[in-house]
């Protein structure tokens, strides 16, 4: 799920730090996204999110076969309202939102890589300074399939 948050740098929170569960789970179980780690990860890109305006969860949706390999199917989403985007000094943000939906197929054999990932992210905001209005609305959708080498 690196496409959701970003590529990991030394010392940064990993996707497992943000989306995984510390407990064993069964199909149908849901758990919250690690809000603290997610918000810190966005902060690296100068996106400021208040904890009370961020929510997200991940679900173990099932066990599926992908290319004959048994995988856990994880799905999830997160949402941030009224965040502070990186806008020029003096601009006042009137409205902002960030939503993401994601899914992935993770082999039960942890030596194998994630085989499928789907990510759909939308970020928008509107800000102004005197007569100048700044609007941003971007949607990124990715479908990634991995074929392990023998």
Predicted regions and their residues:
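PEST-like low-complexity, intrinsically disordered acidic/proline/serine-rich tracts
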Residues: 1-26
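Acidic, serine/threonine-rich low-complexity disordered tracts
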Residues: 33-150
